[in-house]
Amino acid sequence: MTKKYRHLLFDLDGTLTDPMEGITRSVQHALRHFGIEVSDLRELCPFIGPPFAESFRTFYGFDDRQTSEAVSREYFTEKGIFENRLYDGMDELLDTLTSSGYTLCVATSKPRVFAERILDHFGIAPYFSFVGGTGLDGSLPTKADGIAHGLAG
């Protein structure tokens, strides 16, 4: 029997890893800078998934300047990025899939450089032949843009 699919595309947050602690603490830290206190981190779970900039605009009505300032807060890049955990059994799943001949890829709305750091941190980067994400410079602003860029070569 021939495999119907050879390439498998995974999201990062919520699929490979549970990013709740790092993302919500990062958002809490950024909001505190603006005098907004959120003590229950579960209130910030809607930030998991979409790009931070989009979420700050949607949930807090931030303008472009505030959004830029909020997403550039140092907490995530220094600490929050690693306040994250690999889902149980993920190593074994990825090993089984690659051993079975599948090509694995990651697509995320997170900046690609951060996604690569997370994959390296958990020791699972070697399983993936492609990591698509947004650019820190605003290029490839959506997950779909990152995927299209990767497919284009």
Regions found by a protein language model. Give the residues of each.
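Hydrophobic alpha-helical segments typical of transmembrane helices
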Residues: 26, 40-43, 51-56, 114, ...
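A short, structured active-site edge motif that brings together acidic residues
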Residues: 125-140
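Active-site neighborhood of HAD-like aspartate-dependent phosphohydrolases
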Residues: 1-46, 61-62
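Alpha-helix N-cap/helix-start and coil->helix boundary motif
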Residues: 24, 49, 53, 91, ...
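Short, acidic loop-to-helix structural element flanking the phosphoryl-transfer center
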Residues: 4, 79-106, 112-116, 141-144, ...
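Short helix-capping segments at alpha-helix termini
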Residues: 32-38, 99-100, 123-127
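Helix-loop "lid/cap" segments that line or gate small-molecule binding pockets
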Residues: 30-31, 50-63, 118-121, 150-151
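A metal-dependent, Asp-based hydrolase signature
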Residues: 46-78, 88-98
